[in-house]
Amino acid sequence: MLHMGRKRVSVFGSTGCIGQKAVQILRDNPDDFEVVALVAKQDAHLLASQARLLSANMAVVAEDAAYETLRELLRGTCVEVGAGTAGVMDAASRDVDSAVMAITGIAALHPVIRLIKSGVKSIALANKESVVCGGELLINAAKQTGVNIVPVDSEHNAVFQILAHDGCVARVTLTASGGPFLRWTREQMQAVTPSDALAHPVWKMGRKISVDSATMVNKALEVIEAHYLFSLDPDSIDVTVHPESVVHAVAAYPNGTSISLMSVPDMGIPTLHALYWPQSATVCGSTLDLASYGKLTFMEPDLERFPALGFGFEALRSSKPRAACIALNAANEVAVEAFLNFEIAFLDIPNIIMSAMDKLACCEVNSISEAGEYDLICRARTREICDTLKVSEFIR
């Protein structure tokens, strides 16, 4: 428990996987939290239910088409209803102590910047794309205003907790589950369907991030995120495949010792930590029983089968890293959407990203607004690349 009065909290992306974890924590601990705003993309029914359950001051749907439904569902309550970009930005301007940012994709970038400017004390960040595309521009804005970014990704939350004890590390290792195709051959992956890619063996995640895990683009983005969040040189970041997803990160120190953070693979645990930070949560999470696992497995990633993993390092080492990171993220978002819509094959995704990075990672990006503009350019060019590809026969 906080024992310091209730913390005012908003949740962006409250109807998604991480958002629902946050809502459950807020529901279970009403003495610790006051809910100011809940923001969802389009699920008006679940959002309205959450707003009533948590007595939220405000509920916003990003899709204008869902506004009337949300307004009708909350008629007779004291909940203020909003919609569209204006509604999301209004929610991000409200006076809160902490905000959970669980919106998917680069759509979170401008709300994160608005939160930073609004004077929020901490952001529980479950969106890596805003850091990938905002880079040091976003990190510096947070530092200048005294905003603490507490990552919710299990790997980065682990690094955050480890470095809080001793930040003088030599190397950091991020673990990767390997996704659903860890032991598939390239030939087998030629026939991957969206339903195959969405069937993650360990984590329950949204559609986009599930595909990212399957291609291992997710880990490429996490390498970039770790670089910016913790000021780590790309050469000091390693990735190790760990199918059990029990060890989330390892920090190696100059004296030859290493410290890891371990827990059961449950996103509620880092979400709980980020919501209560800087206090320690005393509510019980899932307990790790190592003996029940018998053994833990670690292996080197296979870049021949999962070339996308290397894209994060390539982007950071390029002559125009900001542009390269934006191109990587934009191309991936477009390609994943095309794959989920049965327009391209699974193995087309890394090829499309590589082509986009080769063609587009070549300009200066000097502001958040320029990052947004360049993202749109990259998306348009990536759609052109997608349009040149024929849909694989197995998808028809």
Curated annotation (Swiss-Prot):
GO terms under biological process: isopentenyl diphosphate biosynthetic process, methylerythritol 4-phosphate pathway involved in terpenoid biosynthetic process
NCBIfam families the UniProt entry points to: Dxr
Enzyme Commission number(s) of this protein: 1.1.1.267
Sites where the protein binds 1-deoxy-D-xylulose 5-phosphate: K128, S154, E155, S177, H200, S213, N218, K219, E222
Record organism: Anaplasma marginale (strain Florida)
Keywords, sorted A to Z: Isoprene biosynthesis, Manganese, Metal-binding, NADP, Oxidoreductase
Disulfide bond entries: none
Family stated for the protein in its record: Belongs to the DXR family.
MF terms (GO), sorted A to Z: 1-deoxy-D-xylulose-5-phosphate reductoisomerase activity; manganese ion binding; NADPH binding
Manganese among keywords: yes
Cofactor entry: Mg(2+); Mn(2+)
Protein name stated in the entry: 1-deoxy-D-xylulose 5-phosphate reductoisomerase
Taxonomy, superkingdom: Bacteria
One Pfam family this sequence matches: DXP_reductoisom
Binding site for NADPH: T15, G16, I18, N127, E129, G206
Catalytic activity: 2-C-methyl-D-erythritol 4-phosphate + NADP(+) = 1-deoxy-D-xylulose 5-phosphate + NADPH + H(+)
EC top class named in words: oxidoreductase
UniProt pathway: Isoprenoid biosynthesis; isopentenyl diphosphate biosynthesis via DXP pathway; isopentenyl diphosphate from 1-deoxy-D-xylulose 5-phosphate: step 1/6
Protein's job: Catalyzes the NADPH-dependent rearrangement and reduction of 1-deoxy-D-xylulose-5-phosphate (DXP) to 2-C-methyl-D-erythritol 4-phosphate (MEP).
Amino-acid positions noted as binding Mn(2+) in the UniProt annotation, renumbered to this chain: D153, E155, E222
